[in-house]
Curated annotation (Swiss-Prot):
Native source species: Nephroselmis olivacea (Green alga)
GO molecular function list: ADP binding; ATP binding; proton-transporting ATP synthase activity, rotational mechanism
Name of the molecule in the record: ATP synthase subunit alpha, chloroplastic
One GO term describing the cellular component: chloroplast thylakoid membrane
PROSITE patterns: ATPASE_ALPHA_BETA (PS00152)
Family: Belongs to the ATPase alpha/beta chains family.
Quaternary context: F-type ATPases have 2 components, CF(1) - the catalytic core - and CF(0) - the membrane proton channel. CF(1) has five subunits: alpha(3), beta(3), gamma(1), delta(1), epsilon(1). CF(0) has four main subunits: a, b, b' and c.
Amino acid sequence: MVKIRPDEISNIIRQQIEQYSQEVKVVSVGTVLQVGDGIARIYGLEKVMAGELLEFEDGTVGIALNLEADNVGAVLMGSGLSIQEGSAVKATGKIAQVPVGEAFLGRVVNALARPIDGKGDIASKESRLLEGPAPGIIERRSVYEPMQTGLIAIDAMIPIGRGQRELIIGDRQTGKTAIATDAIVNQKGSGVICVYVAIGQKASSVAQIVTTLQEKDAMRYTIIVSETADSPATLQYLAPYTGAALAEYFMYSGRHTLVIYDDLSKQAQAYREMSLLLRRPPGREAYPGDVFYLHSRLLERAAKLSDALGEGSMTALPVIETQGGDVSAYIPTNVISITDGQIFLSADIFNAGIRPAINVGISVSRVGSAAQVKAMKQVASKLKLELAQFSELEAFAQFSSDLDAATQAQLARGVRLRELLKQAQSEPLSVADQVATIYTGTNGYLDDLAPTQVRAFLSALRSYLATSKPKYAQIMAANVFTPEAESLVKEAIAETKASFK
């Protein structure tokens, strides 16, 4: 028979009493009234906050968006197929956060910053709010450093600065994504971290972008956030904020970042779908009344930070798709008013074989020459003027056959300058090469060549400068087009013409 030892029992009881905690954990629990189409209506979560994360019985996470008198409308971050009427829902007391850090570079993640590239988990110690506050007025400084894209048409005439928001707008299949990926490829060696956010795109398109960036060795400094067309509307709506949070980590550590949102039209459509299912009153084009705030709070997070905060920057290139070139539709006009300029791509120019298909006439950068290096300023102003005059003359020349010699010469120059702006995809040019190219065109050195020979000649000239005039690149490292650099370019033009067939 087992002998009972009172002292041992009293010790155990004493230990249990010492370990007892009076802390009471209060959990707010509700019940699902209705679920479907990625929306759940919940009864009982009386103290839930707007935007608070909710946890369902099956592990699905939702966000409380509609706080009504007798129920809460939540959007689901998943299919929610195993959620039933009467299921319990728990309020977490947390606002949506995503992990951030250096480990994300070179990876493809979803809107919850979880890897989807099959390369294993991402180790991260830090996290940031999905919808963090934008920097205030005192925390910013004016944009003054250039963000080179490697495209002559943009860097010369629509310059983008670090910390700017420049909209890329145009119809489908006009080369919007190509400009964005070229900008990423051109950041190689500049220390700029790139974040590409794919919203509602085909999985094959995203795979193609990943392949292009890998071939160009650009994935080392790039993070891709992807929510494809088959993703729930909630995740498509959240993806841009995830991209901004990942970029903010680097911006606040004094680094420069470039974020591409491709495209915000799809995000607006996902938000419209959620809002209509939540029975929010529709406005123009059935979008909810706060669709402007949807984009403004995202794009205001792009900034050039002050000296006190480390002078980091986040440059945003949002993409908007238009229908039939209509830039006066609701979402395009909203985003045009939020951004610091727009690059307008035209289907007519694209179909005419001019790539990139930028309509220079209505494209603008509101930062302007403040974001250009001195060498580019020296040669670009003449290019802008000559192309503007050419556009006017070209329209006039269609109605008149007998033109004087000066007008004919100006038209011939304009045709060659237009050829000069053409560039193949994923072949960005350095500032030195761009300056030499523009100088050659604006000073009449292409006038005696046939328009079909222009691109081949310029390519030969750039190769000749690199191999036979290495001093030119050394001088241009200071980003100033000196008389010595000019004479080297003149020599190279003459020598290339002598051997050019």
